[in-house]
């Protein structure tokens, strides 16, 4: 009975209107939260688009397909990469040239409205311990329009045995 109630609560929670919230950050930046109901079918379409993009363009190194997935005015928040689809192509063309054995592997995904979250294992070559990456991509009208990421090197030793994935 407890499981049935928990499942029912989860289903109903996706049908309730989300509360709009605004969060202020240092420097005056504001982040608007969700407003309205979640569209789980659209969220799944967005997730599938982002996973296909990541697999084709990053894992298979097909930067020539960027225009299929990225808007022309793609917004980049990574401080080491410029904004725009053409800048994305230039950045990853150079990265793949410098690191021909680099690896980008999706471990898990999640969605929230028009945002898709990826938890990724990435490394430049087989001898590299790698990095744990969280990519956040915003999708609008079937195109990826914005990207944020957080990158953490995988340490040689850890205070626990849980691993990063």
Language model: regions and residue ranges:
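Bacterial N-terminal signal peptides
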Residues: 5-15
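Short, low-complexity N-terminal intrinsically disordered segments enriched in polar/charged residues
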Residues: 20-68, 161-165
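Short loop/turn motifs at secondary-structure junctions and domain boundaries
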Residues: 52, 99-100, 126-129
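A solvent-exposed, acidic/Ser-Thr-rich amphipathic alpha-helical stretch
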Residues: 63-112
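Short, solvent-exposed coil/turn segments at beta-strand boundaries
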Residues: 66-69, 111-115, 137-145
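Short, surface-exposed coil-to-beta transition loops
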Residues: 102-104, 129-134
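Short beta-strand segments that buttress and anchor functional surface loops
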Residues: 118-125
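Short beta-strand edge/turn micro-motifs at domain boundaries
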Residues: 133-163
């Amino acid at each position: 009975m407890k499981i049935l109630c928990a499942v029912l609560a989860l289903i109903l929670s996706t049908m309730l209107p989300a509360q709009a919230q605004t969060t202020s950050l240092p420097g005056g930046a504001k982040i608007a939260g969700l407003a309205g109901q979640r569209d789980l079918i659209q969220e799944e379409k967005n997730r599938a688009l982002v996973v296909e993009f990541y697999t084709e363009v990053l894992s298979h190194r097909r930067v020539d397909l960027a225009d299929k997935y990225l808007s022309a005015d793609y917004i980049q928040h990574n401080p080491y990469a410029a904004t725009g689809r053409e800048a994305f192509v230039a950045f990853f063309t150079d990265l793949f040239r410098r690191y021909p054995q680099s690896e980008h592997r999706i471990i898990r995904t999640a969605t929230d409205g028009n945002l898709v979250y990826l938890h990724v294992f990435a490394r430049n070559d087989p001898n590299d311990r790698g990095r744990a990456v969280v990519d956040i991509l915003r999708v609008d009208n079937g195109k990826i329009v914005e990207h944020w990421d957080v990158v953490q090197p995988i340490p040689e030793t850890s205070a626990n045995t849980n691993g990063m994935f």
